Amino acid sequence: MGPAAYVPVLKSRAGELRALSALDSTTKQTITPLIEFTPPQDDVEAHQLRKIDSLASVWGRDQRILADYRYLNDAQVDGGVPAARYLLELMLDRRMRAVPVMDPSNDRAVIEMARRIVSAGAEGCCYRIPLPMDARPDHANERIVDLLKASGLDPEQVDLVLDYGSVFGTQRLGYARSIRNVLAELVHADKWRNLILTATAFPETLKDIPPDGKSSFERIEWQSWSSFAESGPKTARIPTFSDYATAGVTLPHAKYRAALALRYTQDHEWLVFKGRVHSNGEPNFAFRRMCDELTTSQGFSGPQASWGDRYLAGYVDGKMAGSSSTVWRQVATSHHLSFVARQLAGTRLAAASGQRSA
């Protein structure tokens, strides 16, 4: 896998996948998504086929993805074949450029399965290493070395993701300290095919925002990455930026009904507007008013910035419907991916991040 400027972590849900399809070709070339395949709610095989067909349609077969099957480990298709194996083999059969993702929690059978997929033609492998906010270099390196030994792969074959998960305000300093220390002493630092740093400060739920209310959340992961890229240790390799777009880390329960909300990414924060739905399925007036305030403010990127921004402007003008939470997830993700891609393009170190030293 070649270097990407940005690696968003996305769930394989309709809103996120449709947002990928709406990206312009220039933005697509700078992004390699890490897709977390969601667990099946019905027939496992049929579910996997739908997901792969959808992904092939919205992202294409020529664009790389990192395929994370962590939510599929206990599922099987007919005949007892693990769903994760079926997924990866199906992607290879469809000639999709999929990179299997391993993590330290995988048992030997899962690791061996991923090794076989790599041998069968997958474009290398990805290690996703979960780390606490106070992780020390030895903590990270032990997990990485153990996975190298278990998989039998060389660092040059591996995209390494250091995943700090959720990071909130009280953890800001500890997080910044940890990433500087871990990256300064990272094992095989110059050998990894790609080095990626991910985290998110987006909340797991929006329950603390009242209906017809609004709030903002700092993009701590972006602030920490950009600070490190500009002023980190000169000897440390600059990782590729990654985040969870406009979502929290955990997968919501299958029966969870998302609140009507607009999540809008700006330079250093997310704005969140939360509305209510009338009995006819349409958002209430207060939600439309908040959207109108955004589109007339200096913080609005403009209708040409992304599919999501065009939709938002059309909704305010009464040209677009706004009743589906899936549509608002697509709006938020579309805007976020395009916004971050532009933000990174304006960062002088972005072009060199994640890559091995010459």
Question: Where do the language-model regions lie?
Answer:
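Alpha/beta catalytic barrel-like cores
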Residues: 1-107, 193-194, 204-358
